[in-house]
Regions:
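C-terminal regions of RecA-like/P-loop NTPase motor modules
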Residues: 1-2, 11-12, 190-241
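P-loop NTPase motor core
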Residues: 92-172
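Single-residue recognition of alpha-helix boundary sites
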Residues: 38, 107-108, 189
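Conserved P-loop
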Residues: 2-88, 92-95, 99-104
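Phosphate-binding/switch region of NTP-binding enzymes
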Residues: 142-218
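A generic structural signal for well-ordered alpha-helical segments
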Residues: 35, 85, 135, 173-174
Length: 241
């Protein structure tokens, strides 16, 4: 369908974002914080998707989100969830995690008794790209998370910290989203952890941002609620600068 575009428009009405980090940095909590903030801002329906194998929803128990989550265990479950989500007019959707989702794709396409052969990665990448890009059609705000790993970029041969996805998806998944950020967590004491997200271009970490003027500073993520507000605020400020 053809439609006109205003290329001068500066808006964050639609966001598709991937955040990756080491385990235990607070990714799942950030997804819950986003859903709570968007629920309060828009008063519309939101959805948390727990992909079997992650199961970190206990970290969200104090947020008061209620019955807005769903677990998918197979690729068929995922497709049914997407079909239902198209009818619901979701304002925001969070997916935990992309690594678990690619396992569902691999199980569906090649089985579970062996790793993929080299010739099979093509279909896995194609399916994952389609699943990820379709998420944009489900809600105004999409936040996916994924653990990080070190990977060799197949284009330039350099080693990066990337989302922990197979083959060329590790670096290529950045093309599926408007924003790709890396969440850092530094433990100062058993009771004190400082967190920050970077979207700035980095020679050793996969990041991305579709902004006319890039965010070049780390975004501090407060303990508890307020992380999504900090991210959204930084994006809005960059758009208006």
């Amino acid at each position: 369908m053809r439609h006109k575009l205003n290329l001068d428009l500066r808006s964050v009405d639609r966001i598709a974002m991937l955040i990756h980090s080491a385990y235990g940095a607070g990714k799942t909590y950030l997804v819950g914080d986003m859903l709570k903030a968007e629920l309060e801002r828009t008063k519309g329906p939101v959805l948390f998707v727990n992909v079997k194998g992650e199961d970190g929803t206990l970290s969200l128990a104090d947020m008061g989100l209620g019955d807005v989550g769903e677990t998918v265990e197979t690729l068929t479950d995922w497709k049914e969830l997407v079909a239902d989500a198209h009818k619901r007019g979701l304002k925001a959707i969070g997916v935990d995690s992309m690594k678990a989702l690619v396992r569902l794709v691999m199980r569906d396409k090649i089985g579970v008794d062996r790793p993929p052969e080299k010739t099979e990665y093509g279909i896995i990448h194609w399916v994952m790209e389609n699943l990820a890009t379709e998420l944009r059609t489900l809600a105004s705000v999409v936040l996916c998370v994924c653990p990080s790993d070190k990977s060799v970029n197949q284009l330039d041969g350099r080693t990066y910290i990337t989302p922990d996805l197979p083959g060329r998806e590790a670096a290529g998944s950045a093309g599926w989203f408007d924003f790709v950020g890396y969440l850092k967590a530094d433990t100062l004491s058993p009771k004190e952890v400082t967190r920050a997200i970077t979207f700035a271009p980095n020679a050793s970490i996969i990041t991305r941002q579709r902004l006319p003027k890039p965010i070049t500073h780390d975004i501090s993520i407060p303990t508890g609620k307020g992380g999504w507000a900090a991210i959204r605020g930084a994006i809005e400020k960059a758009l208006q600068s």
